Amino acid sequence: MFAIIKNGSKQFRVFEGQEIFVEKISLMEKSNYEFKEILAIGGKNNILGQPFVSGAKVQAQIIKHGRAKKIIVFKYKSKKKYRCKQGHRQNYTKLLITKIIA
């Protein structure tokens, strides 16, 4: 069985036992988190939400918080000696999907 969940502006297709990386969630490690915005449930009988599936939820456990690899943003204007270099590291949360309730 799988579910398609919405977290912020992103959608994830998840299975039980799967680990996913999402935008930072402000909860402690080893605590439980519950997704309530379920767009679809798949398996033996498929359920599509309009826009969400009523009564469905996905339970997950927070494994760890971290920061992604640094990306470099470099802007310049040719022939004008304008150079701007900036780095950015995005915060993330690693989740373990424990249960899908349809």
Curated annotation (Swiss-Prot):
One GO CC term, this protein: ribonucleoprotein complex
One annotated GO biological process: translation
Keywords: Ribonucleoprotein, Ribosomal protein, RNA-binding, rRNA-binding
GO MF annotation, one: rRNA binding
Database matches in PANTHER family: 50S RIBOSOMAL PROTEIN L21, LARGE RIBOSOMAL SUBUNIT PROTEIN BL21M
Function: This protein binds to 23S rRNA in the presence of protein L20.
Assembly behavior: Part of the 50S ribosomal subunit. Contacts protein L20.
Family statement drawn from the similarity comment of this UniProt entry: Belongs to the bacterial ribosomal protein bL21 family.
Listed name of the protein: Large ribosomal subunit protein bL21
Source organism of the structure: Phytoplasma mali (strain AT)
